[in-house]
């Protein structure tokens, strides 16, 4: 594949984002326990990166080794570069943990007791805990011709034990494997009286490595080292063969834990011959092995901030506000009747969205509710409201995306519960994930003595997930605008029925009109710039990868259009290249909250068209998903989106990173006045 316009590598871009996340852990202005959390978030992100992106690269190399990546590199060269950078990132992560964060935690009375630091009393407590709580659950596997190397589960914690001696059957013992069941706690609190610290903890691996001999009686343990294997977690569902998506998916889910290995993590002190054996058994090469100085899974430390009651070491809690348009109205329907309502999460509460649905479930005038679900969590008041509505006799239709990665099982469970109470459940369109965030409520109203049906809509950039609504930045729009409501109605009809392409008046919809409308809007700016008029594009999203959009932005820059991009994660566009993209800037905001809203701004001859969307500018969002972009027409709300979603990010000089033409990011440095987008919005909206 030849590359007409220069692009940056996707996998390297993802690692770059995780480097920016890890930089939060090094920032002394970030509270200490939050710095630990950022280290854990980096580990969690890397797990998914290997399960999906690196697994995909390995498959491509096996299937078509001569192919090129979209940025023009050979697959093998790209893989080698990604591995090298990933190794550096992991090394930096563990160095930061052990040399900076853990010593600082110890100074604050938060300590992890390694087995070589246990005194006699601590040792006796640890022995009792191991024998009573751990040993009954563990299953040792001795390796011999009758006990082949087990296929360990994806991301499970395992221990490889080197043994010496003969067992009760006279067999020569060489090696054993112990897998720690997921039911066992990865972190155990040591009693305060024994610890000597305000908060003392022991890792599961410390118990295992010290007492593993109890699992192999009368044998000598020469070494015991932890390891973890990451596997390909993509699910394969043959779209041409399936007759029931839910049944097909339920059959595939167990296989996720046993896919092809893509990464081996071992403790740094693991003997070389043991590492070689693990690599052979995993069918991996040396470059796929990550030797870490400490625990092989730092995600397990994510629970520590929740276990430690030290508000001074965490982000200051906040109370999200609620717009007066809602608090001053008798019901949510009255509030929306008075005008469009914009909610900016997490600064403004997600509760009004729940209240809208809960009121709809109980309102005798409501006759129908339609809802899309992508991610909503295992304990969702929103889903409870949908089930209550169905039990109350409403016509409830829910489009549940069963293929939302890593939420498949949760969504299958919700689909079953919804069907059990009489809701209509559909799974979208096979081959096109439904990623759009839409709620439609149909209500019977009486005006001037005449009854009619009135529609109410909520559209969002983020999921219907109350927990992430406090962690992610997103916009939501509540409206009774007739044209928007009609468009949303038609999209739901398309998702639940079978029909041709829609003609929508207000919404841009993928995989049909969203991509061409974006290109057309950029072209208007190009034409205006060439005519000597003011022209500008500002867009905010999670990722920018789609080549034809990037080509249009390059052309816009060359025509003199000022293009400002706020891309939190991976961006394949090269900014600031003379003659190509010198009029384009790319920023990434990384802070307390995950930047998640998608905003498209086009100057449009002064009309200032503003669209909010669930879609990033990626191939998958524009061509392989059902997405919608919706306009903000109300002038006051439009100014809010521009100010709160775009301008504050462009002015941020504390949490913003600027991309340079080589693809590397450098943190923007504050001048005399510090401007932090998220902190400014917290101060504006929250108490």
From Swiss-Prot:
Post-translational note: An intermediate of this reaction is the autophosphorylated ppk in which a phosphate is covalently linked to a histidine residue through a N-P bond.
Cofactor(s) recorded in Swiss-Prot or TrEMBL: Mg(2+)
Stored InterPro entries: PP_kinase, PP_kinase_C_1, PP_kinase_middle, PP_kinase_middle_dom_sf, PPK_C_dom2, PPK_N_dom, PPK_N_dom_sf
CC per GO annotation: polyphosphate kinase complex
UniProt entry tagged with the keyword Kinase: yes
Binding annotation for ATP: 45, 472, 568, 596
Active site per database record: 435
Gene Ontology biological process terms, A to Z: polyphosphate biosynthetic process
Residue runs in coiled coils: none
Keyword Transferase (UniProt): yes
The organism's place on the tree of life at top rank: Bacteria
Keywords noted in UniProt: ATP-binding, Kinase, Magnesium, Metal-binding, Nucleotide-binding, Phosphoprotein, Transferase
Single Gene Ontology MF annotation: polyphosphate kinase activity
EC number from the UniProt entry: 2.7.4.1
Catalytic activity as recorded in UniProt: [phosphate](n) + ATP = [phosphate](n+1) + ADP
Binding site for Mg(2+): 375, 405
PANTHER family for this protein: POLYPHOSPHATE KINASE (PTHR30218:SF0)
Family: Belongs to the polyphosphate kinase 1 (PPK1) family.
Name of the protein: Polyphosphate kinase
Species this chain originates from: Burkholderia lata (strain ATCC 17760 / DSM 23089 / LMG 22485 / NCIMB 9086 / R18194 / 383)
Lineage of the organism: Bacteria, Pseudomonadati, Pseudomonadota, Betaproteobacteria, Burkholderiales
Gene name tied to this protein: ppk
């Amino acid at each position: 594949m030849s590359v007409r316009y220069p692009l940056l590598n996707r996998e390297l871009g993802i690692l770059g984002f995780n480097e920016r996340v890890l930089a939060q852990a090094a920032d002394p202005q970030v509270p200490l326990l939050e710095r630990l959390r950022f280290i854990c978030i980096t580990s969690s992100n890397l797990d998914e990166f290997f399960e999906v992106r690196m697994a995909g690269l390995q498959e491509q190399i096996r299937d078509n080794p001569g192919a090129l990546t979209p940025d023009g590199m050979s697959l093998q060269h790209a893989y080698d570069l990604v591995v090298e950078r990933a190794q550096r990132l992991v090394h930096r992560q563990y160095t930061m943990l052990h040399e900076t964060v853990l010593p600082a935690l110890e100074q604050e009375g938060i300590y992890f007791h390694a087995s070589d630091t246990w005194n006699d009393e601590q040792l006796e407590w640890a022995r009792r805990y191991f024998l009573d709580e751990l040993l009954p659950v563990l299953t040792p596997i001795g390796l011999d011709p009758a006990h082949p190397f087990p296929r360990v589960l994806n991301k499970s914690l395992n221990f490889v034990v080197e043994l010496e001696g003969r067992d009760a059957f006279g067999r020569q013992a060489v090696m054993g494997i112990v897998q720690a069941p997921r039911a066992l706690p990865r972190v155990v609190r040591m009693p305060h009286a024994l610890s000597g610290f305000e908060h003392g903890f022991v890792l599961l691996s410390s118990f295992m490595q010290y007492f593993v001999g109890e699992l192999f009686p009368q044998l000598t343990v020469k070494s015991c080292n932890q390891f973890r294997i990451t596997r390909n977690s993509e699910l394969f569902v043959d779209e041409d063969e399936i007759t029931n998506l839910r049944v097909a998916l339920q059959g595939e889910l167990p296989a996720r834990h046993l896919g092809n290995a893509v990464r081996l993590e071992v403790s740094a002190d693991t003997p070389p011959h043991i590492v070689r054996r693990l690599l052979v058994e995993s069918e991996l090469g040396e470059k796929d092995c990550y030797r870490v100085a400490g625990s092989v899974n730092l995600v397990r430390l994510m629970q520590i901030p929740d276990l430690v009651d030290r508000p001074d070491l965490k982000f200051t809690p906040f109370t999200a506000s609620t717009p007066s348009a809602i608090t001053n109205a008798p019901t949510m329907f009255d509030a929306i009747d008075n005008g469009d309502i914009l909610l900016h999460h997490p600064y403004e509460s997600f509760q009004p969205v729940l209240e809208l649905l809960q009121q709809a479930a109980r309102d005798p005038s409501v006759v129908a509710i339609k809802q899309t679900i992508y991610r909503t969590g295992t304990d969702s008041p929103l889903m409870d409201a949908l089930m209550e509505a169905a039990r109350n006799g409403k016509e409830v239709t829910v489009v549940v995306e069963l293929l939302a990665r890593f939420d498949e099982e949760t969504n299958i469970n919700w689909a079953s519960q919804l069907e059990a109470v009489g809701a209509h459940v559909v799974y979208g369109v096979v081959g096109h994930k439904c990623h759009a965030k839409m709620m439609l409520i149909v209500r019977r109203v009486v005006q001037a003595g005449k009854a009619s049906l009135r529609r109410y809509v909520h559209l969002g950039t983020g999921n219907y997930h109350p927990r992430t609504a406090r962690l992610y930045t997103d916009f939501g729009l509540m409206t009774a605008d007739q044209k928007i409501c009609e468009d949303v109605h038609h999209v739901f009809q398309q998702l639940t029925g079978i029909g041709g392409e829609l003609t929508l008046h207000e919404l841009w919809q993928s995989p049909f009109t969203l991509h061409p409308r974006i290109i057309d809007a950029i072209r208007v700016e190009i034409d205006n710039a060439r005519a000597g008029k003011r022209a500008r594009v500002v867009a905010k999203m999670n990722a920018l990868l789609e080549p034809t959009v990037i080509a249009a932005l390059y052309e816009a820059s060359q025509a003199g259009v000022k293009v400002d991009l706020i891309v939190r994660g991976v961006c394949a566009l090269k900014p600031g290249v003379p003659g190509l993209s010198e009029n384009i800037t790319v920023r990434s905001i990384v802070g307390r909250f995950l930047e998640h809203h998608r905003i498209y701004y086009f100057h449009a001859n002064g009309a200032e068209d503003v669209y909010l969307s669930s879609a990033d500018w990626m191939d998958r969002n524009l061509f392989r998903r059902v997405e919608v972009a919706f306009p903000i027409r109300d002038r006051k709300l439009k100014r809010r989106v521009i100010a709160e979603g775009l301008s504050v990010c462009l002015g941020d000089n504390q949490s913003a990173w600027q991309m340079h033409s080589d693809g590397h990011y450098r943190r923007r440095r504050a001048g005399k006045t510090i401007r932090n987008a998220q902190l400014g919005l917290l101060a504006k909206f929250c108490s």
